[in-house]
């Protein structure tokens, strides 16, 4: 079973749109040092749909090299593409590089019928020996999983479901069905939202965008949850929900870059067409103050880097 705090980590590019290997590796290392357990690579946050297959494999390699410096850290690459052939290729490359599992969003842009989606996952599952997770993200894929389709995919060997929309009726049915019927099938929530209630129904892993810029908060929340300190876990959950909402003023990838800059870390650039606001934008200072306040509320040390985007 995959457990812990996972990050859908951003991929950092340079001014000319090339992969910035040094900054991307630094960011992975920094998150691991602050308690993140695993990396969900080249997903929506990580600009996977904006990258070539070779670039995505290079990110997997960078992640492997960073993870190998730590104990107990793991890689869960996202391999979903608009076409089946590329998704299968990326799954095979991820397996070669030591990933514990792969996740795949359904083929996007075109609207596909259930039988097409099932065949897509069948080919990925049959191509590798490591677990394959489907990624339910209707906002980006134009496809919404049904309980019936999940059941069919389970028979083909699907290992689990990463779910982002958190339709309570759907996700509780999938999770409890697996528990009651002793299915080897895991639900991972694709957001920090809902962590506490879903933990109490058996969910043990979440993929949280906040880990990109405030992994300390997520680490503390999960630590208190696992320790049974319900009062502190609830307090951390409320703080997490508040500061997360404050960062949802723009695309999550852009917000993650901005939040890192607000903490004084050089986060390079997102890939175009995504654009960062100029550093003169007062939003950077507002973000810094919001994150600092969240840390102070939880008694966490607020560390900053040396990149002077804003005045302290």
Where are these regions (language model features)?
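Active-site beta->alpha loop and helix N-cap motifs at the rims of alpha/beta catalytic domains
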Residues: 1-7, 11-142, 306
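Short glycine/serine/threonine-biased micro-segments
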Residues: 2, 36, 41-44, 78, ...
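C-terminal alpha-helical cap/extension of soluble enzyme domains
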Residues: 6-11, 34-35, 210, 214-312
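General structural feature for long, well-ordered alpha-helical segments within catalytic domains
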Residues: 23-27, 55, 59, 86, ...
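Catalytic alpha/beta core domains of metabolic enzymes, predominantly
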Residues: 126, 138-250
């Amino acid at each position: 079973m995959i457990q812990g705090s996972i990050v859908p980590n951003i991929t950092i590019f340079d001014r000319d749109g090339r992969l910035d290997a040094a900054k991307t590796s630094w960011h992975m290392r920094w998150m691991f040092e602050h308690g993140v357990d695993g990396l969900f690579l080249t997903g929506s946050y990580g600009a996977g749909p904006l990258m070539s297959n070779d670039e995505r494999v290079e990110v997997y390699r960078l992640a492997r090299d960073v993870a190998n410096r730590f104990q107990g850290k793991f890689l869960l690459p996202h391999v979903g593409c608009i076409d089946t052939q590329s998704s299968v290729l990326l799954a095979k490359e991820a397996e070669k590089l030591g990933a514990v599992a792969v996740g795949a969003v359904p083929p996007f842009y075109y609207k596909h019928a259930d039988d097409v989606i099932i065949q897509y996952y069948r080919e990925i599952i049959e191509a590798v020996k490591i677990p394959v997770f489907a990624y339910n993200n209707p906002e980006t894929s134009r496809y919404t999983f049904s309980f019936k389709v999940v059941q069919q995919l389970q028979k083909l060997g699907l290992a689990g479901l990463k779910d982002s929309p958190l339709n309570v009726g759907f996700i509780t049915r999938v999770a409890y069905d697996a528990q009651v019927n002793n299915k080897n099938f895991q639900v991972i929530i694709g957001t920090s939202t809902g962590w506490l209630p879903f933990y109490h129904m058996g969910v043990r892993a979440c993929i949280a965008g906040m880990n990109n810029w405030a992994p300390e908060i997520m680490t503390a929340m999960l630590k208190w949850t696992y320790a049974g300190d319900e009062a502190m876990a609830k307090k951390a959950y409320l703080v997490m929900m508040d500061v997360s909402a404050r960062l949802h003023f723009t695309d999550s990838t852009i917000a993650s870059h901005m939040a890192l800059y607000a903490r004084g870390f050089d986060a390079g650039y997102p890939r175009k067409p995504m654009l960062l606001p100029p550093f003169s934008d007062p939003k950077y200072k507002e973000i810094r103050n919001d994150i600092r306040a969240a840390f102070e509320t939880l008694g966490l040390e607020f560390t900053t880097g040396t990149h002077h985007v804003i005045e302290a």
